[in-house]
């Protein structure tokens, strides 16, 4: 075959293949190869003689039917192979002799094609807007610019042969240039003013070629658009906003895999603020409680009403009756209705607070004896209702800050937090991860716990270790067999600890030993499984022991005085504040705690809590030690019986062999169960000992002494008033209080003495 004829058949087929690849999700390497093939294809395609100086192929028309080259020549009835090149003089003479023929339909189709893109970047005020996507509609783009460029200056999915100064643009694929990205566009975009839009004339609308070409982010969504989102310090950034199911998702760019912000609409209040003299844009304000979490700017009132309609539909409870046809969102009001309601609240609150004193205050103002005006009256631009709302927001933020500070201070004692690498937009980022209430929170830093970057509800999820040989300590969190998050630990112990904690928080019955581990050797696998088992058993025991979160003052009730002699020996706690025998040894008689039937269950914050904790942990420790000894004895008996069975199997290879083997298997299963129970007891015993040490560490500072278990023979030999051999730690403040005033240094109290002297001089 002729080489030219082969190229003539190959080029349109390659062009069609590239257009089909536009609709598929490709990896970065495959995408680079496809772009390289496209550039080579552009350089190899034959150019029409002296008619076109560059090549333009619109792949939007190539997704089905004949190729682009075939469509140009499908209506010619002549044989193209018989055509030959004519010399220039003959061509000019033919052109002068014959009039210009009428254009065929195919040539008219060629002339109707959109002109090629300019060889310069678009102006600074260029921006693109995605129309709202309703049910059964295809996504659409609106391209807007102030210049007088042709109407179809931007098409979806094209290949061009232009200068290197013009960056390649792909609207439907993964690759986008800097001026089409949402972060860069947010700085060049100025306003949503309707006056400017009216002066621009009709805007061209370009639809995506097919449903297959739509982005994966907007599939199965109720509505989507590129909207302006208000940042922290008042700037506006364009982001892809999507409503899926009952959540609002914000993406910084259409190529992102994870949303930058995820907001549950059923727990938010939405307020629509129309455009007026004070507000330059139509705004939707989303709030949780008294905190405003998101502000979105819309282009027109119709667009805002459409978004509000979708939010109302999403917020309705599923399967509700007519009486329950109220949206779950607490507030869904317009700004005018909100101001009206706030003004009514202001009038009622003013009438309630002033009461009958209005006439007196009016008379006082008329005579010039009224009080000074409040801050809101001096400002003049802020109503009392708005002031009260701001005060509530400030007080709420302070309360939240205090709670978060307390929580941050206690993070060292909680083993359910730490740094993990998180895969975000094809890149790893270090995040402070924290487990709380069956939810995994991601924070930018451990010092900033007030706001979280993302949160994952773990109930119903699964965990799967492994993410390739380059990341042996990575693991994935799956929900309905779809990846929700990909995390990576720093070492094998850290990975095992997180796996055990996540399995407990997910409510899974799978143990860390049952998981399938890849890309690790035997030693690393042993370390991961050991750490995972320890954390799994620790978290499971904590859940069994404390089914509900306990506050610091929540202690069990104290036993009555008539039940105290029934305490087990060796767990006696000396009560300096309640026993009558030790009252005489106290120097400060003012500190007393009376214990009787009416006040037996009343607790003070300090010493009584330490006493109760120490007594409870001592009892629990002894109970666990006894249980451990019992299990050890049973294990020894089972092992002895197992050895005897093995000897019997060796000596009697006959008909009883099968029965002996079954008995041996039963004994081995019992041994394994007892061994697991023993390991569980060991872990619980270690935890109880640590808590006992913590309670005893605060005991001596509060005047608490704990007697450990003493043998009866030693108590008979030693007198009762014997001083302990090792000195107990002493609290300096309590010792100074016990000293007599003569021992205290005389230079104390000079400041008060001087103050009294000055007062005497003044009088």
Swiss-Prot record:
This protein's UniProt keywords: Cell junction, Cell projection, Coiled coil, Cytoplasm, Cytoskeleton, Phosphoprotein, Repeat
CDD domains attached to this UniProt entry: PH1_AFAP, PH2_AFAP
Organism placement in taxonomy: Eukaryota, Metazoa, Chordata, Craniata, Vertebrata
Stretches with biased composition (Basic and acidic residues): 582-591, 754-763
Modification Phosphotyrosine occurs at: 552
Residue span, PH domain: 220-316, 413-507
Locations listed in the record: Cytoplasm; Cell projection, Podosome; Cell projection, Invadopodium; Cytoplasm, Cytoskeleton, Stress fiber
Annotated function: May be involved in podosome and invadosome formation.
Modified sites of kind Phosphoserine: 98, 104, 153, 329, 343, 742
Main location: cytoplasm
GO cellular component: anchoring junction; cell projection; cytosol; podosome; stress fiber
Subunit architecture: Interacts with CTTN.
Classification via PROSITE patterns: PH_DOMAIN
Region (Disordered): 83-137, 169-210, 343-380, 561-604, 712-763
InterPro entries (UniProt xref): AFAP, PH-like_dom_sf, PH_domain
Protein name: Actin filament-associated protein 1-like 1
Listed SUPFAM superfamilies: PH domain-like (SSF50729)
Domain of life: Eukaryota
Coiled coil: 606-694
Keyword Cytoplasm: yes
Record's compositionally biased regions (Polar residues): 175-185, 712-724
Matches recorded under Pfam families: PH
